[in-house]
A protein has these predicted regions:
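N-terminal strand-loop-strand
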Residues: 12-50
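Short helix-coil junctions and helix-kink-helix linkers
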Residues: 177-186
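Charge-enriched amphipathic alpha-helical scaffolds
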Residues: 186-204
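Long, intrinsically disordered, low-complexity Ser/Thr/Pro-rich regulatory/activation regions
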Residues: 200-222
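Short Pro/Gly-enriched beta-strand edge/turn motifs at strand-loop
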Residues: 2-10
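Short histidine-centered catalytic/ligand-binding loop motif
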Residues: 52-60, 164
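NUDIX/MutT-family hydrolases
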Residues: 103-106, 114-156, 165-178, 191-197
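Active-site segment of metal-dependent pyrophosphate-handling enzymes
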Residues: 18-22, 35, 64-68, 72-123, ...
């Protein structure tokens, strides 16, 4: 009889293994809307379809390195530090086979995307203004966008401008208008001021009044 204690266990090769992809939702605000960056696919599968920047993990490559490589090669974006969002494991999300997607998210000021957007293969899509485009994204990317926007709203509910979407300095009105875009709903002015003002640092300066009465100017931090 074999001694089960000394018999070798199953090899890792005995288990089915999915491919692992990374897909990144790069979010910004443009023309009064939360937008996500899309790239036109050059690969044969879903050729020329708009999709989130994504790639398969290479052997011995970290997830973070794969994300940075993908953003650099497919979207012309570098110098960012996207964060992991969620693993999407629906088995039917990719008709080529079993693929796990480790989704990432990044919030980027519009000005930092200007160079990338010069490419015909890169565009912004309004999350609320172009619902058909978002819903039709391949590989379950619409679910990733929805989760990324949910995350964005959660972090902006707690902090003034964690994604540095506003140029500094700014007025409380500027900040509230940004938060209304992110939230997708109007916000009570006084409630917003009481909650956010302690999280800001005053500059001691006033706006020039070109958009109404002069107002105090603020920067992030407090």
């Amino acid at each position: 009889m074999k001694d089960s204690k000394n018999s070798p266990g199953p090899s890792l090769l005995d288990f089915p293994r999915p491919s692992v992809a990374v897909d990144t939702a790069v979010l910004t605000v443009s023309e009064g809307s939360v937008c996500v960056l899309l790239v036109r696919r050059a690969e044969d599968h879903q050729h020329r379809k708009w999709a989130l920047p994504g790639t398969f993990l290479r052997e011995r490559e970290t997830l973070a390195d794969a994300v940075l490589r993908c953003l650099r090669e497919k979207a012309g974006i570098s110098g960012r530090v996207p964060r992991q969002l969620q693993v999407f494991d629906e088995p039917s999300r990719d008709d080529r086979g079993w693929v796990l997607s480790v989704a990432h998210v990044d919030v980027v000021p519009l000005v930092a995307l200007e160079e990338a957007l010069k490419s015909d293969g890169v565009r912004l899509a309004s999350v609320t203004g172009e619902p058909d485009l978002i819903a039709g994204l391949p590989y379950g990317h619409a679910d990733i966008v929805a989760k990324a926007v949910e995350w964005l709203r959660a972090v902006y509910a707690e902090a003034p401008d964690p994604g540095a979407l506003l140029d500094e300095p700014f007025t409380l009105k500027d900040l509230r208008e940004l938060h209304e875009v992110v939230a997708g709903a109007p916000l009570m002015r006084d409630t917003f001021r009481r909650y956010m003002e302690p999280k800001l640092a005053g500059t001691g300066q006033m706006s020039d009044g070109t958009r109404g009465r002069p107002s105090r100017l603020w920067v992030r931090g407090g």
